[in-house]
C-alpha cells in the first residue's frame, strides 16, 4: 500500500531496475495514461475537482476540457522527472518539498488527494510494490509542508 507519512521508504537497486524496465513502455503512451488517471481520480473523488478551479464545471465533459488534459500531462511529467532522478534523492526531496509548499499556499490543495491520486496512478499502470514505494516517497514529500 501507499503511505503518506513517516520515514521515506528506500528504493532498492532492484526496485529502480523494475521501474526503469516498465516505465518507458508506460511513458510512451503518456497522453492516454495521464488523462485516464486524472479522469478516474475525479470520477472516484468528485469533490477533488474543487482543487482544480480551471476545470470546466460540467463533470460530464471533463475529458474534452483542455485544462484537464494539460493538468494530466503536468502530473505525469512530474512523475517522469522523479523516475529519471531516482539516483539523486536530494534532487527529488528538494523538488517535491518545493511543490508541496506551492500546493499548500498557492493552489490550496487538501493533502489527502496526493495519496488518493497516487493509488489510482499505481493501479492504472498496474504497478507493483516498487511503484507503491516510489509513490509513497512522492506522497510523503508532497505532504511535507502541511
Swiss-Prot record:
It comes from the Eukaryota. PROSITE patterns: GLOBIN. Transmembrane segments: none annotated. Residues 10-146 form the Globin domain. CDD domains: Mb-like. Keywords: Heme, Iron, Metal-binding, Oxygen transport, Transport. SUPFAM superfamilies: Globin-like. Heme b binds at residues 71, 103. InterPro entries: Globin (IPR000971), Globin-like_sf (IPR009050), Globin/Proto (IPR012292), Globin_lamprey/hagfish (IPR013314), Mb-like_M (IPR044399). Gene3D superfamilies: Globins. Monomer. Belongs to the globin family. This is Globin-F1. It comes from Eptatretus burgeri.
